Amino acid sequence: VGLRSLGALIGAVIAGSGLVAMQLPLVLRVNPPTVIPATTVSAPQALVTAAAWPAHGSAALYIPQLGVDQTFNNTVAPIASITKMMTAYVTLQKLPLSVGQTGPCLTVNQVGVSTYDAMKATQQSSVAVAVGERLCENQLVAGLLVHSASNFAVMLASLVAGSVPAFVAEMNTDALALGMTHTHYDDVSGFSAASVSTADDQAHLAAILMRNPVFASDVSMTTLSLPVAGTVTTFTPDLGSYGVIGVKSGRTEVAGGCDVMAVAATYQGHPIVVYAVVLGQ
């Protein structure tokens, strides 16, 4: 991919991520690499000067392999279900998984069903459950990321930390440890308008998370099969096409549309991943 083509790709990724669950108008079809090298290929700043930033809200563009880290109106704002990336991060830090492992399991009780009913009544993204259903960590993390299951976020909080408040405290501790100084989490799902961050903080978190094979595998799935809910689908725009390999979208009335997108490409023969984040769309 040449400079002009990659510049067009970058502009398209930013524009496409702003659509949030609509079609992504990428101008270049690329295949995801299997390995992202640690070496950095230098790229001129002109690469991103023509990027089409959104008309409102905020945005970030991060390409670790090229040393590109650009932002637009990088203000603190509610992030909706993008919050669940940190929910996954804390879970996988406290209860590490390898691909194919199930991790610890729990049995859904009446509280779990009532939580689902309450979330459904308030139009929060959630996954149907039933009393007696057995769900393991790998299923809960996958449901959290694929179908943005807010009730699974609550279950993970209980599984990992014993309670939602204790888990949220871990989220904020880890955010600070990662250098996310403009981020604060108020809940595990992002339904709270007090869960806030910047586009740049979330771009860097996404890049860190994509190094985890379980996370990367989960966010690449377009569907997931669960015992009671059956087959649920992803909300990530054009996942599996045009090089899109993840990661997470979200929307609330207060936050607007939010999207974190990862697109795999090549530049001068080197595999790269373009991370684009938009908030407040």
Enumerate the language-model features and the residues they cover.
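Short, solvent-exposed loop/turn elements at domain surfaces
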Residues: 68-71, 115-117
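Penicillin-recognizing serine hydrolase domain
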Residues: 2-68, 163-281
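Conserved catalytic neighborhood of penicillin-recognizing serine enzymes
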Residues: 113-153, 231-247, 251
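Active-site SXXK
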Residues: 78-106, 202
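A mature extracytoplasmic/lumenal domain signature
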Residues: 63-65, 83, 110-112, 131-133, ...
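Short, well-structured active-site flanking segments
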Residues: 93-112, 213-221
